């Protein structure tokens, strides 16, 4: 199954999942860290609306084992932060893959810290998928939007090339992918030229719309002349209807401090549906507050819920 097929399967709400009491999701993203070394203008993380720390290793092990026992099959070792900042990332991959038996363990990175030896360790631990978020046309734009030194742009490209070399030399089964934000006009043309540089080194490249991050960064995007898609409607070539939002039904999101969130962009904690340090994953997944939110989504009216502020529902 390709990465886009997996994404489309998760962003499509199967009839059996379209209920207030929903089956345990097939996929969960768990946040090893809330930290990131970038300060991207299109991401609300840099607004620092919550504490940004690393997950306790013991809590990680507890939750990952519990979720696998509950029936979760696909585990993303990231959420809102950059997981390559965590020293024990390869150990986390090994624990999920080898000790807990997840069929599919995946990771998304900005690429700057995905150094060859770190990537090698993750692949040897059993990583199934490594995706690079590649959103900039050149070093100048990269520095302006990501808020970091321009030299990292070339470093990211070098890391992508190295990842392909390591995978091929050691015959790992890890898929290598890249996503980019889909722009139109001149920026769109520039992005395609930039993507051509990395295209030989990845298995698949796909586009994502520019998100408003639960309407937290829409002002910044408007100021820069960017046109954002509200909510999380999946990838650009297979946009989903904004209501009901798939994230409420098909994929779990666990923060570094053990909160279960209903949103892909929970930068301020308003979408917390349960505390996994106090209750089980299956229990929190169908908590009363989560059930109530799902009913609103199924009814097509999220006014009065935590989701009403998202521009998708205005």
Language-model segments: what does each one mean?
Residues 1-5, 55-58, 102, 120-284, ...:
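Radical SAM enzyme [4Fe-4S]-AdoMet core and its adjacent flexible, acidic
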Residues 2-129, 145-154, 158:
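Conserved alpha-helical substructure of the radical SAM core
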Residues 13-23, 171, 288, 299-300:
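Short loop/turn hinge sites at secondary-structure boundaries
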Residues 30, 34-37, 239, 301-304:
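Processing junctions and N-termini across compartments
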Residues 37-45, 262-265, 304-313:
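Local cysteine-cluster metal-coordination motifs and their immediate loop/turn environment
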């Amino acid at each position: 199954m390709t990465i886009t097929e997996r994404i489309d399967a998760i962003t499509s709400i199967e009839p059996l999942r379209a209920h207030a009491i929903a089956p345990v999701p097939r996929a969960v993203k768990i946040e090893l860290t809330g930290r990131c070394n970038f300060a991207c203008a299109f991401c609300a993380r840099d607004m620092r609306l919550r504490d940004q720390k690393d997950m306790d290793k013991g809590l990680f092990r507890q939750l990952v084992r519990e979720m696998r026992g509950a029936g979760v099959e696909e585990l993303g070792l990231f959420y809102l932060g950059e997981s390559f900042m965590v020293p024990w990332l390869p150990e986390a991959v090994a624990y999920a893959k080898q000790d807990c038996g997840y069929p599919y363990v995946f990771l998304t990175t900005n690429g700057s810290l995905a150094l060859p030896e770190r990537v090698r360790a993750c692949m040897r631990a059993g990583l199934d998928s490594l995706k690079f978020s590649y959103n900039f046309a050149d070093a100048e734009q990269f520095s302006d939007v990501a808020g970091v030194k321009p030299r990292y742009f070339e470093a990211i490209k070098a890391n992508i090339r190295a990842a392909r070399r390591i995978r091929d030399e050691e015959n790992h089964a890890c898929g290598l992918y890249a996503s980019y934000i889909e722009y139109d006009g001149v920026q769109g043309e520039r992005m395609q030229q930039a993507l051509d540089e990395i295209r030989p080194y990845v298995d698949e490249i796909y586009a994502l719309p520019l998100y408003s991050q639960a309407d937290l960064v829409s002002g910044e995007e408007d100021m820069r002349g960017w046109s954002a898609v509200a909510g999380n409607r999946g990838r650009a070539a297979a946009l989903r209807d904004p209501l009901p939002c798939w994230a409420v039904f098909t994929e779990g999101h666990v923060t570094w401090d053990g909160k279960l969130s209903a949103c892909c962009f929970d930068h301020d904690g308003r979408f917390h549906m349960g505390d996994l340090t106090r209750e089980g994953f299956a229990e929190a997944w169908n908590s009363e507050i989560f059930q109530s939110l799902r009913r609103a989504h199924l009814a097509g009216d999220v006014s009065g819920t935590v989701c009403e502020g998202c521009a998708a529902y205005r």
